[in-house]
Amino acid sequence: MGESGPVVIDPRRHDAVLFGVGDALGSALASQLGQIGVGTAAIAADDPAAAADRLRVRPGRCVVVAGDPAAVEAARAAGFALVIGLAPDGRDGDGLRAAGADAVIAELEQITVRTGDRRMSQLPDASQALTGGADGLAGRHPAVFFDFDGTLSDIVDDPDAARPVAGATAALTRLAARCPVAVLSGRDLADVTKRVGVPGIWYAGSHGFELTAPDGSHHQNDDAAAAIPVLAQAAGRLSDELGTIPGVVVEHKRFGVAVHYRNAARDRVGEVAAAVRAAGRHDALRVTTGREVIELRPDLDWDKGKTLHWVIEHLRRSGSGALTPVYLGDDITDEDAFDAVRGGPVQGVPILVRHNDDGDRATAALFALDSPARAAEFTERLADQLERGEG
């Protein structure tokens, strides 16, 4: 096989780019990365993780660019987030792919760098979104979407122990009486519906592959359903391979396989990530990451952002009129929804619930809240505002 198309360095997902090729540290690409706060370093072909250690960044949030199949193979085994093979004039592209490269390019200019985002610490408090102004909600009719884990619920060591924070369900109930409300989760649909337990709202599970409307009608992505047997097989193999590592939990969901490593030793995380990425390559499944989790799901162009657009369009066709989408989320998978909220026909309000798991990473959100407890308070204040007729 030859080269791939353009690949993207995304500061929301990547803290550093490590080069195993020539004078790349002096390239225009390296300069552009420095301008947006993404670190760079050179690697040794046999130990790319050492460069990540020097920069104090995790391999799971780093990119490796290398022209040596041995370096590509070492980066893949260490669990790096993105491994790019560099094959000038198409030389050894097949060898780089066989070694585990996610993409093969002929020149560094094929790499695109995402710009324009702000760091989490730079965002204003979401209380400002309750006022007027171009980005505010005063005088507008919102449709409010929530992630669950890390947004309505605190992140806990045992995913099965997650529950909405105090006041969250009462605030959701009040809000749902005044505007459309949806919970979009990576959990199974039945799981998140039971945990939240608020009637009369939208629930989407598995990042939107399956959802129920307030009237109880069920919708699913039939293309994703075709991958259910493959996901089951992958879950079984990963349980056998990783289940003996202390602190690792392999969660088989209807439309995904989530491997949690929050409680695992840090020196085993690369091994876990490498195993999941290898399973994704073997079974042609998409690999996504989150807060101390790496997941397999159907390799389809569908995410929380597209789910949000689908729900908004459904509401529009049902006569809801012009709605301003609001999305509250904390994780990398929520960035798709932030992009959708900002890029839709109506400028919406993307709100990040801050955390420390990924450092001060970049985000497409425009506002922030400091915890799920603050998210519950924001929801209550928005319900108050709508009850007073100020929405």
UniProtKB/Swiss-Prot annotation:
Uppermost EC category: hydrolase
Cofactor dependence: Mg(2+)
Active site: D147 (nucleophile)
Binding, substrate: D147, F148, D149
Presence of the UniProt keyword Iron-sulfur in the record: no
Positions with a binding annotation for Mg(2+): D147, D149, D330
This enzyme's EC code(s): 3.1.3.12
Function: Removes the phosphate from trehalose 6-phosphate to produce free trehalose.
Record-linked PANTHER family: TREHALOSE 6-PHOSPHATE PHOSPHATASE (PTHR43768:SF3)
Family listed: Belongs to the trehalose phosphatase family.
Protein name: Trehalose-phosphate phosphatase
Species whose genome carries this gene: Mycobacterium avium (strain 104)
